[in-house]
Structure formats: C-alpha cells, structure tokens
C-alpha cells in the first residue's frame, strides 16, 4: 500500500518547492497578493487589453519559476537556485515587452525588428518551460509539434502540407499579435477566470466549503448510504465555485471518504464515488471549471446563455449519480451514520446562510440584472470581503463574547491569504491558456482548420456518429495530460468547426454551443480515466486504495455522464434550445431559446427518467435486482427519454410527446414489477 501512496503523490498535483527563508515566503505572498489586487483594479478600471494580458502573464510566469522547481525534491532548500532567478527575470521582462513597447509595436505591425523577434523567441521558450514545470510535458510538447508544423509545412504529407512560415513570422505571429499567446484564451483568463477563481478562494477561506459538507451530512447522513449521498451533494455545491476536479475531490473527499468507508463502502468504491462527484463538479454552473467563460468568448454568446445551456445536463448528471449511490447502498445493505455527530439541520443551515448570499448575488446580477460576468463577480467578491471582515465579530457578539480589534484583523488576514491562494491557483490556468494560444495561432497561421476538415471527412465519411466518437476519444486522450481548460481549447479549436460543418452537411442543424459542450464534457471525464486520471489519484491517496481501480470504478460510475453529450448534441432541448433559426436568428448564433415553463419541466423530468434508467441498467438494480426481461424493457427508455426527436426522425414514434409517454410508461411498469418482488431475498429472484 505504501507503494501506491508514493506513486500517487506524483499525480495529485505538481508540487511547489519548499525554501527555508522568510524573505522568500514573504515575497511570494506579496507577489500573489499584488496579482489579485491588479486583477480587481482592472475589473473596475479597465486597461488596454494587450497591456493587461501582458501584465497578467508576467505575474504567472514569474510565480511559476519562483514556486515550481525544475524537478521536485521533497527536501527543503535554504535558497532559490540562481538559474531559476534568471528564468524568472528573463521571463517577466520578455512577457512584459509587448506592454512596455505597445505603441512602438503597433506602429511597425508586421515589420518587426531583430529585437522584437529575439524577445519573442525567448518568451516562447520561457513559456514552454513554465508549462512543463506547472503542468508536465504534455501541453508544451503539443505546442512544439505545432510550431514544427508551422515552419516545415512544405515537407509534411500532402494531405496536411502548407506553404510554411519563416521563424521570424512564426515568432511575431505567436507573441506580438493577438492571434497567439495573447489571444482569446488568455484574454478570458484576464477578464473572467481570475475573478471567479478569487471568488471561490474567498468562499473556501471564509468557511463555505466546510459549511456545504456539514449541511449535506446533516440532511442526508442518517439515511441509507448517507455519507456517499452527502458526498455527491457536497461536491456539487463545492463544484459550483471550484474550478478544479482535483481540488473538489481533495476538499470534500478528505472529510467524506473516511465516513463512506466507516458506513461500509469499500476503499475503492468510496474513492470512486468521490471522484465521480468531484469530476462532475466542473459541470455545475456558474464556474464550470473556468471553461464556460472561454466557450462564451469563442462563440460570442453571453455567459448567462452558456450557463442556461449547461444547467439541465449538469443537474441530470448529479441526480443520476445520487441515484447510483442509492442503488449501491441498497445492494450492499449500507446504513446511515450516527446523526448525533452533527448539530440539528436547521442550526447548521442557518449558521452558513451568509455563505449562500454571495452566490445568490452573483446569480442575481447575471440572470436578473443581466450585467456582465465581470460586474457580477466583482460585486460578489465585494460582498464576500464584508462577510469575512465581520463574520468573526458578529459570531462573538451573538454569543455574548467581547469583540476586539484582533477579531476584525483576522478577517483581513483571511482575505489576504485567500487572495494569495487564488494567485497560486491561477498560475496553471494562465500558463495553460497562453500555451493553448500557440495552438490556436497555428491554426490561423497555417489554415489547419480546413485541412483537418478534409482529413476527418476522409476518415469518417459522412458518419457524424463516427466523428463524435473520434472527438470524444481525442478529448479523453489529451485530457489525461492537459488541464480541462487547455484540453477544451485545443480540441474545440481543432475539431469543433469540422463537426459543425459535417453535421450541417448531413442535415443536422446543430448550434455551436452543443459541439463545444460536447468537447468540454469529455475533457472533464479524462480526470478519472485510467491510467492517468489525476482526480482518481487524489481520491485513492485519501482512501488508501489503488488509484487504477479507483479510476476504473469512477469511470464506470461516470458512463452516465458520457452519454449526455451525445444526447444533447442530437436533442438540443436538453440545452433549453428550441431550434436553430439561421434565416431569422434571435441572436448572433441563431439560437431560439425555450420559453414554455411546462415544456422545460417535461424535458428536464424526462432527462432524469432517461438517466435513471441508464443508471439502473449499469447497476443491474432498480427497486431490487433487475431480471433480464426488465432490463430489456428499460433499454428503449433511454433513447425515448433523452433523444425523442431522433426516434421520430427514424419513424419509430409519431411525435416527441408520444415518445416521452412511452418512456414514462415503460419506466413505471418496470417499477411496479420490481415493487412486487422487493421483499424477496436477492438469491431468490430468478434471472428471467
């Protein structure tokens, strides 16, 4: 078991260095805090986008070389290696170059001098090394391959060849324009992602994470399989404001996995349930693993519309995981936990209402006031500042204790360290989006998008399902080595236009948001896909289980998540999209949103039925053990409930409403047949 634990440490996260120096630690804290202050400043007083992106990336590059060593050693050092200091200074100077010489570069666009090109090469090399340190080699290697392709285009096989670009042109395009490093991905990191990561960091530091866990356990802990069910709910709540699968697993799993084991779940299943719940946390609006902002920017949609499209799949996904946990609990005969370990439900609920308020302010500003995501995050952060400053004095006043200056200062200290933690979290995202910009820049420089379109069409023909399967496989493979955000940018940039073109060619009028969410979903699933599955390694470390078996079991639980992207790709109503009206669009992408509340409830309800039926088929269990003929009856429930329009298209049903009614009828019939034998011992239930 020690072997497993030692091995797992490599995958949970890239370790930061330890240096026994107060000056070093104070400087890191000050730099991180300064970055957060800068981001809040430009949220209220916007700078030129090129300048703000350059400064944003300079903070990230500098911190990477100060925080992350060339290779990780557990032994602490007394000082920072000289070469890392050189990397830090060179990296910061190079990345700030476009900001310092902004007007000069604007005057000589496309006619760069030697100094511009040398700095560009230096910056790209530094970024590749920063990416290797903070994320591992996968993304830098992919970027290098694209850069090689940019230059050696004429020597490539005919089907992917192009005229090639000079090294000078590549360097200028990638670093001195907004087509590469300083393109849309890092622009979203500057404008949106940082503020929402800071919001999540402040909430966590204030105590919201523990509150969500306590609330979930107070509500569900005493019921059958209570700890596992509470884990699902707590991960969903935490996932709303967390941008990382692994962070979600570690935050919630540290508390829930031991209690799941105590309730009777095996180490593997306890870890796997937390992995599935933690990974799916990235699907939950409003943050959605930070990719929601990039999706909105890529598609020219409002962030609110991206959340609208994601809400039914996210809730269907979590409710079906809750159902799977219930089925596992019934099969294993699990009990709840002693409720005396927790305070009363009402007392726990009331104790953290102030944590829910900033989330409500965020949602109100976005959905009701219809302000920008930047304004919504800024307002919510401001309210959180007040909560953190006054929550300790307020608690003491309520309990009749004396309030002193130290109680107020404690709130300011929490704010400081939350801002430091947010900056450290953002180093990975900022570097990932900068490197992903190189890939996006390569596509615009070489015309690779059209080449890929021809190549995919050659491989898959007109088979749209084959193209989707290839895309899912690509997302899973790349996601094993890339952060979710970078994986989404890479795959969507390469494949999304191809899927849209071929879908429309085959008569499927698919909105772009469906393709982008499809890619996003499978990128997330990579976090629990063996053999890498970083979230699985994190959970395995807590559960003291084998990370591969935890990953396999977690992926098995997440198979229900894997069918959802196919469902909403073909049935856009699952994304609240009525139709795609290209002749008279209601917005820039021609999307007509659903407006009938009853129809929305019907679609949501049937999505739950379809996902529950699929979950029962996976588990072989419903009210009790499923017989073969009952499984046969449940199989058609899944397509009838999730993609009724496809059933109508192929002449299997006269209309969607009839498809829904047949699905509901079959599901109810199987429930009744199961109810009649629910008290029988499992070994007495005949297979047929």
Report each predicted region and the residues it spans.
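Transmembrane alpha-helix interface/packing and boundary motifs in multi-pass membrane proteins
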Residues: 200-204, 235-244, 276-282, 436, ...
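Transmembrane helical segments that form the transport core of multi-pass membrane transport proteins
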Residues: 371-482, 488-491, 623, 631-677, ...
């Amino acid at each position: 078991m020690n072997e497993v634990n030692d091995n797992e440490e490599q995958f949970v996260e890239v370790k930061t260095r330890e240096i026994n120096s107060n000056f070093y630690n104070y400087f890191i804290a000050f730099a991180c805090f300064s970055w957060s202050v800068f981001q809040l400043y430009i949220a209220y007083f916007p700078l030129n986008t090129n300048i703000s992106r350059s400064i944003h990336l300079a903070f990230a590059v500098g911190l990477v070389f100060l925080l992350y060593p060339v290779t990780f050693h557990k032994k602490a050092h007394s000082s920072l290696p000289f070469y890392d200091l050189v990397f830090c200074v060179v990296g910061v100077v190079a990345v700030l170059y476009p900001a310092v010489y902004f007007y000069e570069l604007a005057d000589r666009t496309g006619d760069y001098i030697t100094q511009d090109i040398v700095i560009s090469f230096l910056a790209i090399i530094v970024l590749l090394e920063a990416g290797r340190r903070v994320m591992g080699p996968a993304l830098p290697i992919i970027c290098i391959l694209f850069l090689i392709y940019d230059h050696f285009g004429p020597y490539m096989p005919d089907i992917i060849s192009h005229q090639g670009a000079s090294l000078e042109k590549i360097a200028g395009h990638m670093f001195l324009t907004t087509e590469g490093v300083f393109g849309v991905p890092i622009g979203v990191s500057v404008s949106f992602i940082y503020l929402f990561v800071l919001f999540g960091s402040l909430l966590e530091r204030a105590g919201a994470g523990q509150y969500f866990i306590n609330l979930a356990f107070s509500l569900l802990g005493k019921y059958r399989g209570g700890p596992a069910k509470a884990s699902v709910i707590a991960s969903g709540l935490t996932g709303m404001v967390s941008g990382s699968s692994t962070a979600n697993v570690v935050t919630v799993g540290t508390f829930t996995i031991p209690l799941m084991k105590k309730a009777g779940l095996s180490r593997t299943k306890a870890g796997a349930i937390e992995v599935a719940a933690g990974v799916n946390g990235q699907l939950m609006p409003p943050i959605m693993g930070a990719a929601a902002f990039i999706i909105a920017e890529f598609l020219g949609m409002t962030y609110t519309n991206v959340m609208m499209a994601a809400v039914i799949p996210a809730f269907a996904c979590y409710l079906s995981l809750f159902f799977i946990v219930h089925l596992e609990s019934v099969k294993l005969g699990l009990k709840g936990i002693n409720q005396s370990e927790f305070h009363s439900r009402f007392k726990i609920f009331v104790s953290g209402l102030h944590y829910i308020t900033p989330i409500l302010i965020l949602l109100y500003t976005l959905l009701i006031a219809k302000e920008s995501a930047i304004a919504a995050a800024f307002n919510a952060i401001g309210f959180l500042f007040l909560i953190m400053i006054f929550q300790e004095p307020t608690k003491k006043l309520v309990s009749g204790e004396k309030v002193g200056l130290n109680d107020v200062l404690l709130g300011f200290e929490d704010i400081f360290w939350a801002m430091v933690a947010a900056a450290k979290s953002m180093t990975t995202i900022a570097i990932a989006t900068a490197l992903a910009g190189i890939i996006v820049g390569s596509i615009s420089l070489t015309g690779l998008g059209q080449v890929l379109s021809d190549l995919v069409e050659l491989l898959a023909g007109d088979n749209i399902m084959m193209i989707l399967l290839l895309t899912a496989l690509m997302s899973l493979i790349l996601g094993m080595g890339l952060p979710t955000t970078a994986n989404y940018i890479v795959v969507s940039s390469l494949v999304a236009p191809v899927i849209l073109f071929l879908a429309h060619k085959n008569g499927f009028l698919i909105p772009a948001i469906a393709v982008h969410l499809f890619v996003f979903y499978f990128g997330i699933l990579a976090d629990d896909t063996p053999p890498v599955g970083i979230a699985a390694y994190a959970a395995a470390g807590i559960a003291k289980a084998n990370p591969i078996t935890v990953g396999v079991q977690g992926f098995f639980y997440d198979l229900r998540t894997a069918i959802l992207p196919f469902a909403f790709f073909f049935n856009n109503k699952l994304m609240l999209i009525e139709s795609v009206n290209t002749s008279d669009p209601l917005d820039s992408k021609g999307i007509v949103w659903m407006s009938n509340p009853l129809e929305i409830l019907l679609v949501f309800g049937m999505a739950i039925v379809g996902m529950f039926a699929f979950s029962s088929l996976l588990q072989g269990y419903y009210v009790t053990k499923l017989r073969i003929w009952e499984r046969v009856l449940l199989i058609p429930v899944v397509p009838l409930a999730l993609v009724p329009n496809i059933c109508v298209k192929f002449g299997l049903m006269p209309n969607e409403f009839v498809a829904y009614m047949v699905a509901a009828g079959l599901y109810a019939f199987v429930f009744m047949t199961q109810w009649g034998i629910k008290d029988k011992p499992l070994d007495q239930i005949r297979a047929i």
